Amino acid sequence: MLVRYAPGMDTMVALLRGINVGGKHRLPMQDLRDLLAELGCEDVKTYIQSGNAVFRGDADIAALPKLICSAIEERFGFGPQVLVMAASRFESIVAGNPFAGKVADPRSVHVSFLAEEAIAADVERMHSECKDNESFHLTKHALYFHAPDGIGRSAFASKAEKLLGVAATGRNWRTVCKIAEMARD
């Protein structure tokens, strides 16, 4: 199945998990852009090396993660988790940030994009894993996390996905804002 371009279609955002981390699962962004273009995506743009892509196309958005993952696995030998959403959903996640304008340093805010709704999330345990100065907010499509001491020093951050009970991929707030800006262009 190829993605087909159709004027007026929503722009889509793809978030790949676990690529270019610690020298593993190397996927240069030019190669990702080329691969997405070969799949029929139009106006493909990427941001930094962590696997963020914005493109236009006309395809079943639910089928795209598997299509993209399979194409990467065939060409590069590994199949990363891929989340794809309409730019309108991505924008609603950006607009829904409960920490916007409320934290001293927006770099301390992170968003985990959920592959599906976390209906079985262990919210009570999530609260107990947060340090006193940390906080989170869970919605249908995202987990917002404020980590003033840094995400690397947070026990919550390393356990969040397990406690959510669903696959997720995280981005810092600066990256989220840049992807949103790209999707608006």
Regions found by a protein language model. Give the residues of each.
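Surface-exposed, charge/polar-rich loops and edge strands
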Residues: 3-185
